[in-house]
Amino acid sequence: MDKILIIEDDVEINTLLTDFLKENGYVVYSQYDGLHVLDFLHKEKIDLIILDIMLPYRSGDIILADIRRQFTIPVLIISAKETTQNKIDLLRLGADDYITKPFDMEEVLARIESNLRRVQFENRSAA
């Protein structure tokens, strides 16, 4: 079973994503501020991260940069920021995908599946 970490401070959105992904067969972990994400990633093998950009204490772009320095886990950004430049900046910083809020749950699921397929293909090619 693939493991997904959701880092989203909005409890309603976090719960909605968690419940939906569990119903679709994923093991889901939740964080609400990302303060301890690196410690968590060193302890638990995660297959994909869903990361909000507007978080308390540390912004998602800083968390993304920290993740990229140490891990190759796919990161799917969810954000209310709709500007093209914001999307470009985050993709260049290391995000693998970007979805604008409000989002369609089926689109989120399709993007997760797509990113996980890509990683599985890359792992098979490297073996």
Predicted regions mapped to residue ranges:
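N-terminal/domain-start alpha-helical segments
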Residues: 1-123
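Regulatory hinge/linker segments at domain boundaries
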Residues: 125-127
